[in-house]
Amino acid sequence: MRTHSRESQSTVTPERALAFLREGNQRFVQNLRAHRDLLAQVNATREGQWPFATVLSCIDSRTSAELIFDQGLGDVMSIRIAGNIVNEDILGSMEFSCKVAGSRLVVVLGHSNCGAIKGACDHVQLGNLSTLLNKIQPSVYFEKTVRQNRTSKNDAFVARVTEIQVRRSVEAVVERSVVLREMVERGEIGLVGGVYSVDSGQVEFLEDTWMCGNVRHFYLDLPGVGPAAAVA
């Protein structure tokens, strides 16, 4: 399988970019990964890169976007930070990947059994990590369905907080970046959230987070703190 070129990138729609990732994840789960000559891809991309998607994911060693979506060199721009939080540096990276490098899709990808989410659930204090976990705390607060054992030992609670964090990050992208919001509104890029299972290898896209053009299925409706303030 060849890496994307300037010509092939120009034909990719946001919807097709999402389909590429769905198909790649199914290959990964079924252990039917596409054959790639990686050295040939190194040669093909030495003059430039033409990615079709950008993935914001956690630093967890099990969640490499290129692997779980079965993509090659030059296909995906990968942004990684614990808890898939959004800040100005993350947004700047996304703006470069979409406006400059031509990416057609932005995915915010959380994952099950996330250490950062668990740390936030347990109110862990540890050096600079505490500052990062504090940015996830609103997602813990916004989870209202679990009344007992609101700690990392409750898998259902952790899963709910994980999904809320993904949704907050998706919303923060369009709330805090004029560049990306306008590209979404013009249908130039798509934006969607998803959760990766470290047990099965499957990515579940949160369909109601999909934004592209006039299609926007959800608005974050969480009391008290808006997405922009909560993810700063």
Would you name each region that the model predicts?
Residues L56-C58, R80, V107-H111, V192-S197:
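Short beta-strand segments
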Residues D60-R62, H111-A116:
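Gly/Ser/Thr-rich loops at beta-strand to alpha-helix junctions
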Residues R62-I79, I85:
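Catalytic core of membrane glycerolipid acyltransferases/transacylases, capturing the structured
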Residues F52-T54, S103-V106:
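Short active-site oxyanion
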